[in-house]
Amino acid sequence: MAEFATIARPYAKALFGLAQEKNQIESWLGGLEKLAAVVQEGKVASLIDRPETNASEKADILIDLVGLKDKELKNFVIVLAGQKRLSILPEVYAQYQDLTLSFNHIKSAVIYSAYPLTDKQVGELVQMLNKRFDSELKISVEIEPELIGGIKVEVGDQVLDLSVQGKLSALYTTMTN
């Protein structure tokens, strides 16, 4: 959700800045991942949405469920609970993860394919994409049958569409204009 992204951004940046100071970037990433997963569970999500449960109870429950030990992460959860922002934790995690990758000079990339790719094909694609984007890429592969054939690659806000669906869409646009 775009709204959650806008709201989560300053929280993720502030937490990342503190993590840099404390040299805790990777360990906090793990804690945020657990928090994001727990918040998305049905019972926990409904608890977060209940107005009769106060903020400190919600924070304590989350902290206990995840087993947080780090004082700063606990305080972060308490602040989010106080601001009624616990539901943005998955987006905070996603943005914190992007900041971590960027800090480590790694970009996140998604390869969409109409059909499953072999390990060899993925390896060759990774080599080509690393050269094209001049950085190390963290790759995930997703199957999208609606592409018909070929692949589509997203790296940050850049899209490389080499799919049959993309070619047909471009042809349609050219013919109708």
From Swiss-Prot:
Annotated GO biological process: proton motive force-driven ATP synthesis
Localization (cell): Cell inner membrane
InterPro entries in alphabetical order: ATP_synth_OSCP/delta_N_sf (IPR026015), ATPase_OSCP/d_CS (IPR020781), ATPase_OSCP/dsu (IPR000711)
GO CC, one annotated term: plasma membrane
Membrane-topology annotation of the record: Peripheral membrane protein
GO molecular function, one term: proton-transporting ATP synthase activity, rotational mechanism
Family the UniProt entry places it in: Belongs to the ATPase delta chain family.
Subunit structure: F-type ATPases have 2 components, F(1) - the catalytic core - and F(0) - the membrane proton channel. F(1) has five subunits: alpha(3), beta(3), gamma(1), delta(1), epsilon(1). F(0) has three main subunits: a(1), b(2) and c(10-14). The alpha and beta chains form an alternating ring which encloses part of the gamma chain. F(1) is attached to F(0) by a central stalk formed by the gamma and epsilon chains, while a peripheral stalk is formed by the delta and b chains.
Name recorded for this polypeptide: ATP synthase subunit delta
Organism the protein comes from: Neisseria meningitidis serogroup B (strain ATCC BAA-335 / MC58)
Lineage of origin: Bacteria, Pseudomonadati, Pseudomonadota, Betaproteobacteria, Neisseriales
